[in-house]
Amino acid sequence: KKSKITFVDIDKDAVKLTKENLKLNDILLNQVYLTNSYHSNKYIKKQFYDLIFANILFNPLKKLAPLFNLIIKPNSFLILSGLLNEQIPYIINFYNKYGFKKKKIFYLNGWGSIIMKRNP
């Protein structure tokens, strides 16, 4: 089964570089949706995802929790990174309110990443 991928970045240059990297790695662009807007994008809000990976800072991650809750499939995984170590407990508690449970935490040089799973 072919997978479809959605990439979102607010930086237009990052989206351009992603396209170039996809071509270099022989990934078909018709299987990939690229955009530089996640809030107003109707395409994203109509999809349901098996995996969401977000590498952004604490405040944007808090703002995205309701959207992630709507678009992720039950029993699917959410990976959050771009967090300072001391922010990890707060973001875990915040995402718990949206039905996400912590599975694993990784720490490296003052930064942390969390793997969470969406409850059914």
Where are these regions (language model features)?
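Conserved SAM/SAH cofactor-binding pocket of Class I
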Residues: 1-40
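Core SAM-dependent methyltransferase catalytic element
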Residues: 101-120
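Short alpha-helix immediately C-terminal to the canonical SAM-binding loop
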Residues: 15-16, 61, 88
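A short SAM/SAH-binding and catalytic strip from SAM-dependent methyltransferases
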Residues: 50-63
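A short acidic, Gly/Pro-enriched loop at the edge of an enzyme's catalytic core
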Residues: 39-51
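Conserved class I S-adenosyl-L-methionine
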Residues: 83-98
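A short glycine-rich, Lys/Arg-flanked "PGG" loop and its adjoining helix->strand segment in the class I
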Residues: 62-77
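Short strand-turn motif at the edge of the Rossmann-like AdoMet-binding core
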Residues: 56, 80-85
